[in-house]
Every structure is written in structure tokens, then in C-alpha cells.
Regions:
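Extracellular repetitive beta-rich solenoid segments
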Residues: 1-35
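Surface-exposed ligand/attachment interfaces on beta-rich extracellular proteins
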Residues: 21, 35-70, 79-94
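Short hydrophobic/aromatic-rich beta-strand motifs
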Residues: 25, 65-67, 74-75, 104-106
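Generic beta-strand structural signal
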Residues: 25-27, 67-69, 124-126
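Hydrophobic residues embedded in beta-strands of well-ordered beta-sheets
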Residues: 29, 72-74, 128-131
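Beta-strand residues in well-ordered beta-sheet regions across diverse protein folds
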Residues: 34, 75-77, 133
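Extracellular jelly-roll beta-sandwich "head" domains, especially the C-terminal globular C1q domain
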Residues: 58, 81-94, 98-150
Length: 150
């Protein structure tokens, strides 16, 4: 297809380690990889990072964290617990917040997914507040939450 340029994006979210992103460009020849640098995760509760609020804390082997990819999408990860349902767990900083309130569905692992687990509603507000709401159990997985930041 002469005269056409195609772009293909690959955004890889690795549960542990550093996220990666690649953009592949193809004109009239072969695909070319334009590697894009992606920031490291920001650990909730880490030095210079947002603090936990309302008794929320990390639990298990996947600490709460977030990052923004080169396309402006913010991704959360980790497992938190001990906070009261419907309270602010932490607040994302400016530049990592959604334009509109966003709502995500995850689960708590009180017994694991399936019969032992329960649905969790995670609201991320325009002021950066991250608010998990659940009916039973205390552990909340954040990995399903991602949105475009403004």
C-alpha cells in the first residue's frame, strides 16, 4: 500500500517490575520499533509519594502503586486492606487524575475470587481520591483500575 503509514501500539503492563511501551511504525518497508521510555511505578506510602489514608495499607506481595504511560493513561496495581468501605484510601497527585469520576469493578480476595471473594467498586474522583467500596471482606485489588489522565 504505497504512500500509507501505519502505527501499531503495544503497551505492556507487567505486574511486577517496570512497565514498558513500544510504538511500531511501518511505511513502505518493514516495521520499525520506536521504543518509548515509561516512568517507574509510584509506590503509595513511599517517600515523596501519596500517603495511605483512613487506616488503608498494603497487604500481600503486591504493594499499591501507579504509573502513567506515554499516552496519558494511569494504571493502578496492588492489594490493600484494613480501611473502612467507602473511605478514601489515598489521593493521586495532580497530573494523574481523571477528567471525570471513574468507576472500576474489582474483587476482594477474602477467600479468593469466586465463591470466597466479593465484588469491589473502586471510584477515582477528579480530585484524585481513590475510594474502594465493598460489601464483605477487607482486601481490595487495584489492578483493574486505569483511566486517561488530564
Amino acid at each position: 500500500m504505497a504512500g500509507r503509514t501505519f502505527l501499531r501500539f503495544l503497551n505492556s503492563f507487567r505486574h511486577t517490575g517496570t512497565p514498558s511501551s513500544s510504538t511500531f511504525l511501518r511505511g513502505d518497508g518493514a516495521w520499525s520499533n520506536l521504543e518509548t521510555s515509561v516512568e517507574d511505578f509510584h509506590a503509595i506510602g513511599g517517600a515523596g509519594e501519596p500517603a495511605f489514608q483512613n487506616s488503608w495499607a498494603n497487604t500481600g506481595s503486591s504493594p499499591a502503586a501507579f504509573y502513567k504511560d506515554p499516552f496519558g493513561r494511569v494504571y493502578l496495581r496492588g492489594n490493600i486492606n484494613t480501611g473502612a468501605s467507602g473511605t478514601v484510601a489515598f489521593t493521586l497527585p495532580s497530573g494523574y487524575r481523571p477528567e471525570y469520576n471513574t468507576f472500576h469493578v474489582s474483587y476482594n480476595n477474602n477467600g479468593g475470587p469466586g465463591p470466597g471473594g466479593a465484588a469491589v467498586h473502586i471510584e477515582i474522583q477528579t480530585d484524585g481520591d481513590v475510594i474502594p467500596t465493598y460489601g464483605a471482606g477487607t482486601d481490595v485489588w487495584l489492578d483493574s483500575a486505569h483511566f486517561r489522565a488530564v
